[in-house]
């Protein structure tokens, strides 16, 4: 169960790391990152859970010895992940409307929108990773999935430090740097798994 927990919680861990670094950067940034991260995660999860369901079918077809069907259902999960991008982008105004309804201070809301927008732009990477991960976990090959997600989280820590505070040759970008770091790090696991 541990590899599955690691794989499904990778984005949560990355957003938590964002908040750890942002807490040392600005009180406004830390106030903005949590609600924006949770809201984006809520929208992304519909697509991620659906694409990740490919792993269930991979397990069934793997048990039946039908490798071709394993590849086919994984491909469907990948297509769904890619198709989620325009929907996630279309949900950005709805997210902004919800943030306005909540009524946080204007400076917090401005940073919430920055973080939320980046999470939504890169949101398709989460279902992409879950679909690819489902191919391996459905065949009880969880080691690669686990290591890929750990690598993604490690990349996020380094990029958060560099992009939030302006270290390692990067400009100081605050909350936007944290969001960009998480989007980049979200691409690591799928790239390793491919």
Regions found by a protein language model. Name each.
Residues 4, 8, 19-20, 56, ...:
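Transmembrane alpha-helix boundary and packing residues in multipass membrane permease domains
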Residues 9, 13-31, 99-106, 162-173:
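Helix-terminus/linker motif at the lipid-water interface of multi-pass membrane proteins
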Residues 91-92, 130, 144-173, 187-193:
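Alpha-helical transmembrane segments of multi-pass membrane transporters
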Residues 1-13, 17, 39-46, 83, ...:
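Residue-level signal for short hydrophobic patches within transmembrane helices
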Residues 22-41, 107-113, 175-176, 180:
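Interfacial/gating helices of multi-pass transporter permease domains
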Residues 1-4, 58-124, 170-194:
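Short alpha-helical transmembrane segments in multi-pass integral membrane proteins
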Residues 32-89, 93, 126-145:
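Small-residue-rich hydrophobic transmembrane alpha-helices
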Residues 68, 78-81, 135-162, 176-183:
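Alpha-helical transmembrane segments of multi-pass membrane transporters/permeases
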């Amino acid at each position: 169960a541990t590899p599955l927990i690691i794989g499904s919680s990778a984005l949560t861990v990355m957003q938590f790391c964002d908040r750890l670094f942002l807490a040392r950067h600005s009180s406004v940034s830390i106030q903005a990152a949590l609600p924006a991260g949770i809201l984006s995660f809520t929208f992304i999860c519909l697509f991620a859970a659906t694409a990740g369901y490919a792993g269930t079918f991979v397990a069934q077809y793997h048990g039946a010895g039908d490798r071709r069907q394993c590849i086919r259902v994984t491909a469907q999960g990948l297509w769904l992940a890619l198709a989620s991008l325009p929907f996630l982008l279309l949900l950005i105004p709805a997210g902004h409307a919800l943030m306005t309804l909540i009524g946080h201070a204007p400076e917090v809301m401005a940073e919430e929108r920055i973080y939320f927008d980046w999470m939504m732009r890169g949101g398709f990477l989460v279902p992409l990773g879950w679909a690819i991960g489902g191919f391996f976990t459905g065949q009880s090959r969880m080691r690669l999935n686990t290591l890929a997600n750990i690598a993604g989280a490690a990349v996020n820590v380094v990029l958060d430090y560099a992009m939030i505070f302006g270290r390692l040759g990067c400009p100081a970008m605050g909350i936007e740097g944290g969001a960009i770091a998480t989007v980049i790090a979200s691409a690591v696991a799928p790239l390793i798994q491919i």
